[in-house]
A protein has these predicted regions:
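Auxiliary N-terminal substrate/complex-recognition segments of SAM-dependent methyltransferases
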Residues: 100, 212, 336-337, 363
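Local cysteine-cluster metal-coordination motifs and their immediate loop/turn environment
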Residues: 9-22
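Short active-site neighborhood of thiol/selenol oxidoreductases, capturing the structured segment around
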Residues: 4-8
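C-terminal scaffold of the Radical SAM
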Residues: 1-3, 22-45, 49-329
Length: 373
C-alpha cells in the first residue's frame, strides 16, 4: 500500500498545546495562492503514483470555505490517479463544519472524516484553547451522520490537567453513546514553546501523575472494549475492524508522499520534508522550484528498526516472516538480545512467529521502543 498526505496549514485560531505548522487568517489570507501552489506540487508527483489511501490533515482542512475545498479536491482528481483508493480521509473541526463543506467533501470522494473533539468537557476545552464546546462537538458529529458519512473517527486527548477520573470516563462514555466507527485517544504532549508547556513549567498547570494516567488509560480501554470497540493500536480503537488504513500504512512501514508546507514523505529509501513556511512554499512552487527542504537517505537497518517500533504499536503485533519480507531484515538479527530481555521482563510476548507488546506494556511502550532503536 502507498499513501498521500495533504497538509492544510490554516487554522482559525491556535490551540494552546499544538506545535504543528499552521497560520491563522490574520497571518495569511491568500488561500487561492496556496491552492494554486498545492496543485503545482501535485503535478510534481510521479506520474505512476496511485495511492491506496489519502489523508487531508492540518491545520484545519475545514477552515477552507466549501468552494475552496472543492477546488482542492478537483485538483487532486485532475493530477493523481485515485483508482486504487480505498480510504479517503479528511480532518474536521466541530467549529468550522457546515453542511456545504460536507457536501463538497462527499462530492469530491472523501469517505472518512476525523473530527477533532479532544474532550466533551467544556472546562478542558477552554484549557486546551479549543474554539468549540461539548454541545458543538456533538452537533458536528450528528451533522456528519446527516451528510451520509458512515466512517467517522473522534479524536480525544487524555491526561488533560484538571480532569478527574470520572471526567475521563465521562468522555469515553459519550463516545460510546455516539458510536463512531473509530476513536483516536492521544496522550497530551507538552511541546516546546507552546502556551500549555509554559504554564506547566511555571507551575500554573499540574499534569496528572503517571499512576493516575495509567489507571485512566486502562479504565477507558476496558469501557470501550465492553462497548464493542477493538483496541488495535496503542492510541486507537475501532468497531468492526474499521481501522484507519492510512495510519496502518505508516505503522507497517509503507511508502507515502506528503504535499503542503511542512509535509513529509517516505519514498524509495528516502525521507524528505517540505519547507515549514507557507510563503516560501508558495514562492518556490510558483517559480517552478521544489518545496523540499530536507532529504535523508535511510540506512536499511535503521529503517527496519524504525518499522519494527512502529509496527509494535499495533496490539496484534507483527508476523516476523512478513516483517522480513517488507524490510529485508529478520527481527532477531536486528535486536534479538534486547527482545529476549524484554520477553523475560514481561514487556514483549512471542507466540510462534508473532511478536507483540504485552498488555501491561501498552502504557510504557516508549521505554520498550527506546531499547529497540
Amino acid at each position: 500500500m502507498t499513501g498521500l498526505y495533504i497538509h492544510i496549514p490554516i487554522c482559525i485560531s491556535r490551540c494552546r498545546y499544538c506545535d504543528f505548522y499552521k497560520m491563522t487568517p490574520n497571518e495569511w489570507d491568500n488561500v487561492a495562492l496556496f491552492l494554486q501552489s498545492l496543485e503545482l506540487e501535485f503535478q510534481r508527483l510521479p506520474k505512476d503514483f496511485a495511492p491506496d489511501t489519502v489523508f487531508i490533515g492540518g491545520g484545519t482542512p475545514t477552515a477552507l470555505e466549501a468552494a475552496d475545498f472543492s477546488i482542492m479536491l478537483d485538483s487532486i482528481h485532475r493530477h493523481i490517479d485515485l483508482s486504487n483508493v480505498v480510504e479517503f480521509s479528511s480532518e474536521a473541526n466541530p467549529g468550522s463544519l457546515t453542511p456545504e463543506k460536507l457536501a463538497a467533501m462527499k462530492e469530491g470522494g472523501v469517505n472518512r472524516v476525523s473530527i477533532g473533539v479532544q474532550s466533551f468537557n467544556d472546562k478542558a476545552l477552554r484549557l486546551l484553547g479549543r474554539t468549540h464546546r461539548a454541545r458543538g462537538a456533538i452537533e458536528g458529529y450528528h451533522m456528519l451522520r446527516e451528510a451520509g458519512f458512515d466512517n467517522v473517527n473522534i479524536d480525544l486527548i487524555q491526561s488533560i490537567p484538571g480532569m478527574k477520573p470520572e471526567d475521563v470516563l465521562a468522555d469515553a462514555r459519550q463516545v460510546a453513546e455516539l458510536r463512531p466507527e473509530h476513536l483516536s485517544y492521544y496522550n497530551l504532549i507538552y511541546e516546546p514553546g507552546t502556551p500549555m508547556t509554559r504554564d506547566r513549567d511555571e507551575g500554573r498547570l499540574i499534569p496528572p501523575g503517571d499512576d493516575e494516567e495509567a489507571d485512566n488509560y486502562f479504565a477507558v480501554k476496558k469501557l470501550l472494549e465492553d462497548e464493542g470497540y477493538g483496541h488495535y493500536e496503542i492510541s486507537n480503537f475501532s468497531r468492526d475492524r474499521k481501522h484507519c488504513l492510512h495510519n496502518v500504512l505508516y505503522w507497517q512501514g509503507g511508502e507515502y508522499f506528503g504535499c503542503g508546507p511542512s509535509a513529509h514523505s517516505h519514498w524509495k529509501g528516502k525521507r524528505f520534508g517540505n519547507i515549514p513556511d507557507l510563503k516560501v512554499y508558495c514562492d518556490r512552487l510558483q517559480k517552478g522550484e521544489s518545496p523540499v527542504d530536507m532529504i535523508e537517505v535511510l540506512d536499511p537497518k535503521d529503517k527496519a528498526r524504525e518499522t519494527l517500533v512502529m509496527w509494535l504499536r499495533m496490539t496484534e503485533g507483527l508476523d516476523m516472516d512478513h516483517f522480513q519480507s517488507v524490510t529485508g531484515h529478520h527481527v532477531d538479527m536486528l535486536c534479538g538480545d534486547a527482545i529476549g530481555s524484554m520477553i523475560e521482563e514481561g514487556l514483549l510476548e512471542r507466540l510462534e512467529n508473532r511478536l507483540a507488546l504485552s498488555s501491561g506494556a501498552l502504557f510504557v511502550c516508549n521505554s520498550v521502543f527506546s531499547e529497540l532503536v
